[in-house]
A protein has these predicted regions:
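Conserved acetyl-CoA pyrophosphate-binding loop and the N-cap/start of the following alpha-helix
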Residues: 82, 86-94
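A conserved beta-turn-beta hairpin within the catalytic core of GNAT-like acetyltransferases
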Residues: 63-73, 83, 130-131
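Conserved GNAT acetyl-CoA-binding A-motif
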Residues: 92, 99-111
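Conserved beta-strand in the GNAT
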Residues: 47, 53-62, 72, 77
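Active-site rim helix/loop that mediates acceptor-substrate recognition in acyltransferases
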Residues: 25-47
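Conserved active-site alpha-helix within GNAT-family acetyltransferase domains
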Residues: 89, 105, 113-131, 136-137
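Active-site acidic-Proline motif in GNAT/NAT acetyltransferases
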Residues: 79-81, 85, 113-114
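A short beta-loop-alpha structural element at the N-terminal edge
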Residues: 1-16
Length: 140
């Protein structure tokens, strides 16, 4: 079952950090980042637990622009030990439904092409690939 995280235990932080490492070798989750996310009204961290451990997570970030209210889905990862159980679909469906309740116009996400199963899931859920230049500037 998907839950929106509002507080956490030391074990939750350990589980989330491990999941971020599975997402990318350079990704991590620490207490400062998690507290910032949980204290931001426009950031919604969703998790799925299995046997008391967080085994899947995704973050729904709401942005208000002059045109629309938009959501970005970030940091979606299911533990490699738990893949194939439908957790990714359950998590994504919950975030899509939450965005609808928040009157979001559209949801954006990016996904590494190497994440074949994730990309297939996003397309199955109705996401369409669109042509754009995606840029980032690392500041820290």
């Amino acid at each position: 079952m998907v839950e929106e995280l509002s507080s956490y235990t030391p074990q939750d932080l350990t589980d989330l950090d491990a999941l971020m490492h599975e997402l990318s070798a350079t990704s991590f989750c620490n207490e400062e980042l998690l507290n910032s996310a949980l204290n931001d009204a426009n950031v919604h961290v969703y998790v799925i637990r299995d046997e008391g451990h967080i085994v899947a997570t995704g973050t729904l970030c709401i942005k208000h622009t002059l045109e629309f209210t938009i959501a970005d889905i970030e940091s979606v990862v299911v533990s490699s030990k738990c893949r194939g159980r439908g957790y990714g679909k359950e998590l994504m469906t919950a975030m899509i439904e939450a965005a609808k309740k928040m009157n979001v116009h559209h949801i954006q996400l990016t996904s590494n092409p190497a994440r074949v199963a994730a990309n297939r899931l996003y397309q199955e859920l109705g996401f369409e690939r669109y042509e754009t230049n995606c840029y980032k500037m690392i500041l820290a």
